[in-house]
């Protein structure tokens, strides 16, 4: 069974309560339940964490080494400027998939830049909460394609 660390960045815990026109009405708890249900179907064990703190997110990324087979991360606002999170992603050997609920490329100019994406295996953006589900399938695909 593959082990995946899911990291939600700042303010993701308010999904369903804030900017519903951007992030939708589904709640943070509902997103996590969706992730757990789909992961079980794919025979993937998930640990879900959320932090509003850059340092805490970095520590979570570091903790994945030798403990998880992949990371799914929504860096949220840190996507656009956190070189520290980018460096943390680069420092681990496990594949990292960046996800976003909204399409960051269809939003404000500053949101169209992802400094973290360059260190990720791939990016899934704009599919609402299903971005996380698609990322689980990407993890499964990576597993199958490398014979793991």
UniProtKB/Swiss-Prot annotation:
CDD domains: DHQase_II (cd00466). Substrate binds at residues 74, 80, 87, 101-102, 111. InterPro entries: DHquinase_II, DHquinase_II_CS, DHquinase_II_sf. The keyword Amino-acid biosynthesis applies. It holds the Pfam family DHquinase_II. The active site is at 23 (proton acceptor), 100 (proton donor). Gene3D superfamilies: Dehydroquinase, class II. It catalyses: 3-dehydroquinate = 3-dehydroshikimate + H2O. One of its GO terms (molecular function) is 3-dehydroquinate dehydratase activity. The record marks 18 as: Transition state stabilizer. Keywords: Amino-acid biosynthesis, Aromatic amino acid biosynthesis, Lyase. Pathway: Metabolic intermediate biosynthesis; chorismate biosynthesis; chorismate from D-erythrose 4-phosphate and phosphoenolpyruvate: step 3/7. GO terms for biological process: amino acid biosynthetic process; aromatic amino acid family biosynthetic process; chorismate biosynthetic process; quinate catabolic process. Its EC number is 4.2.1.10. Catalyzes a trans-dehydration via an enolate intermediate. Belongs to the type-II 3-dehydroquinase family. Homododecamer. PANTHER family: CATABOLIC 3-DEHYDROQUINASE (PTHR21272:SF3). This is 3-dehydroquinate dehydratase. The lineage of its organism: Bacteria, Bacillati, Bacillota, Clostridia, Thermoanaerobacterales. The gene is aroQ.
